[in-house]
Design a protein with these regions (language model features):
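Helix C-cap/helix->beta junction micro-motif
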Residues: 29, 134, 194-195, 343, ...
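Generic structural signal for small/hydrophobic residues in well-ordered secondary structure
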Residues: 35, 77, 93, 117, ...
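Conserved core of the PLP fold type I
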Residues: 61-191, 206-220, 227
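PLP-dependent enzyme catalytic core of the Aspartate aminotransferase-like
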Residues: 79, 87, 158, 338-347, ...
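Hydrophobic residues in well-ordered beta-strands that form the structural core
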Residues: 119, 140, 201, 347-349
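Conserved glycine-rich beta-strand-loop-beta hairpin in the small C-terminal domain of fold type I
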Residues: 276, 280, 296-305, 313-326, ...
Length: 386
């Protein structure tokens, strides 16, 4: 048989016509105001690694192949939760090289090829790719926007295929900023308990919630196995260190769950010793760092609301560091290209996130505030002029 490529991969790996246009336009424009900034590193607010190097560097050359991850680092993650009102035993904390790897471990642990995962729409396209690479299928449930607020369409959870194994919650959601309420959580848990699903909560943006909504660590989950995913990428703005975690409540799966997760993780042992060593002192400063990031985000949210006062344009952002803007009558791909061509402003078009209607764009709340404000005023002028 002729060698070919795995059916896990898309048949067409080339860039879409839109991205070819966008790339060509970037080359022509040369410089632009970037409203797609995805990390504090690129936004000029990095974590001060020099402040923790002396505390960590002595362990850079240590090799301790624990399938759950270094105990001292798991203890640091447990303290991270405790500082925020959560309580997890270190035995139920699994360290990974990234949130993506945490997904991969869970998919291998809980699913068989052909099984299904329920994912939120609008949502981040990476989730579909991660599932496909494990021979899994994704099916949508929906967040709807009305009166300037995003809400779970709990009825859409009922349209699930029989092979569903996991309900995936992203809270705060990327890109809408929706945060699960207790009522929405209870509806999800009720469905998961009845249908024998696990719940995976991607809360990488969980440190950045602005409306006082609790994180669901202490809410009732009945007998449902629940996994909470996070990492250094967002909590201390350091994606370059490649360390994530899952903290879990085994529910009906009991003690065997830990054995199963460790079995899969032990096959990879992906996290480096420097990442383990640095995570411990970095997490001890995570609340201080959070305050720096949150100031930038809140300043930009204030600017956003002053420029676009209407909730029809900017629905409420409960958390995260992105905001979704809707311009009725616009085509989001056309608007994205027009903003770059005419004003040197780079945004993300809504179709990347499967928004249900046209006219959505997504902007980062990490961009330096004066540049952010200037760009928003140009966007407002451009969209109101049409």
């Amino acid at each position: 048989m002729k060698l070919g490529f795995s059916s896990r991969l898309p048949e067409d790996l080339s860039d879409s016509p839109f991205f070819l246009q966008l790339s060509a336009l970037k080359r022509k424009v040369g410089t632009w105001t970037d409203l797609t900034v995805s990390t504090p590193l690129s936004a000029g607010i990095p974590f001060d690694l020099d402040s923790v190097l002396s505390a960590a560097s002595g362990n850079f050359s240590v090799w301790n192949p624990d399938s759950s991850g270094w105990l001292q680092t798991r203890e640091a993650v447990a303290r991270y939760f405790a500082e925020r009102g959560g309580s997890f035993d270190v035995e139920h904390i699994q360290l990974t090289a990234s949130t993506s790897e945490a997904y991969s471990i869970l998919f291998k642990t809980l699913c068989n090829p052909g099984d299904a995962i329920l994912t939120p729409v609008p949502g981040y396209p990476l989730l579909d790719s991660l599932a496909a690479l494990e021979f899994l299928k994704t099916f949508p449930y929906f967040l709807t926007c009305a009166d300037g607020k995003w809400r779970l369409d709990s009825g859409s959870l009922c349209a699930f295929p029989p092979q569903t194994k996991i309900l995936l919650i992203v809270s705060p959601n990327n890109p809408t900023g929706h945060v699960f309420s207790k009522e929405e959580w209870n509806a999800a848990v009720e469905m998961a308990s009845r249908e024998n699903w696990a719940i995976v909560v991607d809360e990488v943006f969980g440190d950045f919630i602005y409306d006082g909504t609790e994180r669901p660590w202490n809410w009732d989950s009945k007998d449902v196995p629940v996994f909470f995913l996070g990492g250094l990428s967002k909590s201390v703005g350091s994606p370059q260190l490649k360390l994530g975690w899952m903290a879990y409540r085994p529910g009906r799966l009991g003690a065997r769950l830990k054995e199963a997760v460790e079995y899969v993780a032990d096959a990879y042992l992906s996290v480096s010793s420097p990442a383990f060593a640095l995570a411990t002192p970095m997490l001890s400063h995570s609340l201080e760092y959070k305050a720096k990031i949150q100031k930038r985000i809140c300043d930009n949210l204030s600017v956003l609301r002053s420029v676009f006062g209407q909730v029809e344009v900017v629905p409420n952002v409960q958390g995260g560091w992105y905001a979704a803007l809707h311009f009725d009558g616009e085509e989001d791909d056309v608007l994205t290209l027009r903003l770059l061509r005419k004003h040197g402003i780079l945004v993300q078009p809504g179709f990347l996130f499967d928004f249900p209607e046209d006219g959505w764009i997504v902007v980062s709340l990490l961009t330096e505030t004066s540049a952010f404000e200037q760009a928003l005023r140009k966007i407002a002028q451009e969209t109101r002029a049409r």
